[in-house]
Amino acid sequence: GGLAATRGDQIGIQVIKGLMARVPQLKPEDVDDLIVGCAFPEAEQGMNYGKVLAVGAGLPEPVSGMTVNRFCSSGVQSIADATAKIRAGWSDVIIAGGCETMSHIPMGGSIFRPNPDWKFGEQPNVYVSMGITAENVAANHGISREDMDAFGLESNRRAFEAIKAGKFKE
């Protein structure tokens, strides 16, 4: 795609700047934390990606940054973590989401180094990504790619209709 050559941090910084511009009543110093999920936090997506994005977006130094790694669900996990901190009263304003450019990181990361204390195959599910999980579900349960795509499309259609109907408003 058109963004394949663009670094993930460049994209993330622009998204955060755009978010701040869309909510002018939110002052940068009111942001308590920036939590970013990243499946492969290495190369330009590493070294505390959350703080890198916070600084790059112009948030002041006291705004902390955190990187969450839960592979494919990293972005969703960052939002869940932010929600928990706010509900617990530990923070008032947190920017959270996922940021990644998969075009820049080889599948599986740069160098795969499984735990040498385990015999390969002894812990088969530890290193399984969502892509492989989908393949296994398809093979084990006879679900075709077309069926998966149709399910995903219907799920998105239902979500869109629920949003239009106001079902996600508080």
Feature annotation, model-predicted:
Residues G2-P28, A43-M47, A54-E170:
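Acyl-thioester C-C bond-transforming condensing/cleaving domain
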Residues E29-G37:
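Short glycine-rich phosphate-binding loop at a beta-alpha junction
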Residues F40:
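Thiamine diphosphate
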